[in-house]
């Protein structure tokens, strides 16, 4: 827009970007918004759950095509043949155990009934957190899970 100052907030994950948008105040000045948005983003950890498209060795893991993988804050967390086992291991991480808010975005390849099971898993394992399940509709990633 002509006459408007545009600032890019360098988020690294979709949940970080969402957190920045939630605190933006259209009535505040640019500096105030940048500070608030950057702070909001810094408090977000992200897990991304997907599958291996090919065999590979990465980060000490021998990954086979079709294995389920979890990335936590951009680093390979674990791989498992079973998605359920991977999620059970992921939910035990301090990132989620110490979270106040957890948002679970499920992808286009996840049935709502399966997403509900994942919600129950996180709700049982993280009783102190407020947990929200959302249809993200994202391709490739079964889940994107944010913890704040």
Where in the sequence are the language-model features?
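N-terminal loops that bind phosphate or other acidic moieties
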Residues: 1-148
């Amino acid at each position: 827009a002509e006459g408007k100052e545009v600032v890019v907030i360098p988020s690294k994950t979709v949940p970080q970007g969402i957190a920045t948008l939630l605190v933006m105040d259209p009535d505040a000045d640019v500096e105030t918004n940048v500070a608030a948005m950057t702070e909001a983003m810094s408090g977000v950890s992200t897990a991304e759950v997907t599958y291996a498209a090919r065999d590979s060795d990465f980060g000490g893991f021998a990954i086979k095509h079709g294995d389920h993988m979890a990335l936590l804050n951009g680093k390979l967390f674990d791989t498992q043949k079973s998605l359920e086992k991977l999620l059970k291991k992921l939910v035990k991480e301090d990132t989620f155990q110490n979270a106040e808010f957890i948002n679970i975005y499920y992808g286009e390849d996840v049935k709502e009934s399966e997403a509900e099971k994942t919600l129950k898993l996180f709700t049982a394992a993280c009783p102190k957190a407020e947990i929200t399940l959302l249809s993200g509709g994202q391709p490739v990633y079964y889940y994107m899970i944010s913890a704040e």
